[in-house]
Amino acid sequence: MRVILLGAPGAGKGTQAKFITEKFGIPQVSTGDMLRAAVKAETELGLKAKSVMDSGGLVSDDLIIGLIKDRLAQPDCANGVLFDGFPRTIPQAEALLKAGLEIDHVLEIAVDDEEIVKRMSGRRVHEGSGRIYHTIFNPPKVECIDDVTGEPLLQRKDDVEETVRHRLSVYHAQTKPLVEFYSKLEAKDGKPKCSHIPGVGSVEEITAKVLEALK
């Protein structure tokens, strides 16, 4: 079973990805991890990618597809794979299709933008321990102070509202169109199966919907 998991930053993809990989015994494959592994192993594709990255360029979709083919040939992918962060764009999805790499399921975890902004911009972190609080959902006893050490809490740069809104706009421009792309493919060819899952409610409720969609 090959699964693509889509959703805006902050939609809760990480939690559901962990559930899917454990439940179905398939690896989570990210292009970043593949690139690093190929470069470290000094494979032919890894050396090509390193040359491009060292010169400040972007690794081409063709090169990424080559890495994916190599990765899918490994024994742990025999039962399937969960794609993490790929494809991100229509050209990448088309390249995947052209390479004959079939996808069985496309899951979109859908959460309203304002809910995501509320979730992410409210996060506060204790740098020393990594403890995470939230101004609304899990506030510290004293505002902006760690419960255990009494030290100040920080807001990560990625969680600043302006940054969150920028990342959401990039997602809507580049990755959201993939939902329509794969839905049209499903209507035409009968696969991949596309499922739209509301990412609100408890983790358990969302997980149950994910499991139902993958049956």
Curated annotation (Swiss-Prot):
Root EC class: transferase
Region: NMP, residue numbers: 30-59
Gene3D superfamilies on file: P-loop containing nucleotide triphosphate hydrolases
UniProt binding sites for ATP: 10-15, 123, 132-133, 201
Gene Ontology CC: cytoplasm
Region ranges (LID): 122-159
Residue positions binding AMP: 31, 36, 57-59, 85-88, 92, 156, 167
Enzyme Commission number(s) of this protein: 2.7.4.3
InterPro entries recorded: Adenyl_kin_sub (IPR006259), Adenylat/UMP-CMP_kin (IPR000850), Adenylat_kinase_CS (IPR033690), Adenylate_kinase_lid-dom (IPR007862), P-loop_NTPase (IPR027417)
PROSITE patterns (UniProt xref): ADENYLATE_KINASE
Compartments where found: Cytoplasm
Family, per entry: Belongs to the adenylate kinase family.
HAMAP family, per the entry: Adenylate_kinase_Adk
Domain remarks: Consists of three domains, a large central CORE domain and two small peripheral domains, NMPbind and LID, which undergo movements during catalysis. The LID domain closes over the site of phosphoryl transfer upon ATP binding. Assembling and dissambling the active center during each catalytic cycle provides an effective means to prevent ATP hydrolysis.
Record's protein name: Adenylate kinase
Species this chain originates from: Pseudomonas savastanoi pv. phaseolicola (strain 1448A / Race 6) (Pseudomonas syringae pv. phaseolicola (strain 1448A / Race 6))
Classification of source organism: Bacteria, Pseudomonadati, Pseudomonadota, Gammaproteobacteria, Pseudomonadales
Gene this protein is translated from: adk
